Amino acid sequence: MSRILLGVNIDHIATLRQARGTSYPDPVHAAAVAEHAGADGITIHLREDRRHIIDRDVYLLAKTLKTRMNFECAVTEEMLNIACEVKPTYVCLVPEKRQEVTTEGGLDVAGQLDKITAAVSRLAANGIQVSLFIDADKTQIDAAVASGAPLIEIHTGCYADAKTADEEAKELERIREMAKYAHGKGLIVNAGHGLHYHNVKPIAAIPELYELNIGHAIVARAAIDGLATAVKDMKTLMLEGRRGE
C-alpha cells in the first residue's frame, strides 16, 4: 500500500492575522507547528491582493521550512517572478478572481495552453516542479500533459460541496476515474479543496493520489480544539495579574 501525503495549507492562519492587522498569529510559526505534527509539506497561496499570505511570509517560509513549500499562485508575470526568486519545491498554478472568497474552480489549461506551457517551462528552468490545479476532466488532464507539467491537483470542491449522497457518490467516482486516467498518463496526481474530517477518507482511499492539500478544515478544528486551553491560559494570567504575581 502506497503512502499518502498531507500538505497543510496555512492561508487561514494568515486570514486571522490580517483580520486585525496584527503580527499574530504568525503563519511561519504555524508552519513549524504543522511540520512538527506530521505535515509532509506546507501550502500557501500568495494572491494578487495579498488578502492573507503576504510576501514576508513567503520569503521567511522559504528559509525556515523543514519539509516542502507548495506555492500556489496565478499565472501572472509578478507571481512567476516571485516564484523564480524563492524557488519553492512546487508551484501550483491556480485560477484567481479578485471577487472570489476562495478558488472557485480549476485552471482552464486547454483554453490557454500556450500561456501555461510557457509558465511551466520557465518554472522548470528554475528547478521548480509545477502542478496545475484542474477539474477532474479528461480535456484538462490531456492539456496538462501537453503543457509539460509533471503534476496536477484535482479540484475536489464539487465533491465537498455535494448536497446529496448521490451527488457526492457521483463526484467521488469522477475523481476516482480521472485520478486513474491522469496517473496512466504519467502525471503525479494530488487533490484538494474543501476536504474536511467527514469527507476525506474516501478521497484518501484512491490509490493513485499522492498528496492531499487541506487547510481550512484543519485551522477550523484547531480553533475549536485549542479554545479551552486558550481560555484557561488567559483566565490564569488575569487572576495572577489581579494577585500581583
Swiss-Prot record:
GO terms for molecular function: pyridoxine 5'-phosphate synthase activity. Keywords: Cytoplasm, Pyridoxine biosynthesis, Transferase. 1-deoxy-D-xylulose 5-phosphate binds at residues 11-12, 47, 52, 102. The active site is at 45 (proton acceptor), 72 (proton acceptor), 193 (proton donor). The record marks 153 as: Transition state stabilizer. Its main location: cytoplasm. This is Pyridoxine 5'-phosphate synthase. The gene is pdxJ.
